[in-house]
């Protein structure tokens, strides 16, 4: 009987710990109403240093639906969403792909930062608190992502986002010069297509 009680207590404690971690994470995300930052992104393919890819740029987001991700080095690439359309622009190729906004976090991990409630995160992930400001998210069903790690600074600014995939790829995005709760014009999240750009509009499919 004591073993059964101990087992039930252990299971309850684990479930409470996961729920508490999820609540803590979502509270931190909820506190980010708008944000801008510079980023340094490193992609490691299969653990081989020779295959590492680094990029830098800047980003901004504004709840409930606006997102802007500008890569400046080594190439000019832009990902911009106004909540209904998503533009993916490659300056070197002079090409823009227009998509409908997806809810697929595997494809667009930034969607976690726009989450408004625990239901979506709890439905998709098991959340574990690694330390006071670091959270590990393990997908319940997604086959593409192995895990997502999110770390906040002591003042609850986003410090880094790390993604491990089933393709043995690891991406770490470190943020600096973070500003939160700032006023950002909605027009910043509409993409103006440059002249002589090849347009692939997938919203009409």
From Swiss-Prot:
Residues 1-21 form the signal peptide. Monomer. It is found in: Periplasm. Participates in the translocation of lipoproteins from the inner membrane to the outer membrane. Only forms a complex with a lipoprotein if the residue after the N-terminal Cys is not an aspartate (The Asp acts as a targeting signal to indicate that the lipoprotein should stay in the inner membrane). It holds the Pfam family LolA. Belongs to the LolA family. GO terms for cellular component: outer membrane-bounded periplasmic space. The gene is lolA. GO terms for biological process: lipoprotein localization to outer membrane; lipoprotein transport. Keywords: Chaperone, Periplasm, Protein transport, Signal, Transport. Its main location: periplasm. This is Outer-membrane lipoprotein carrier protein.
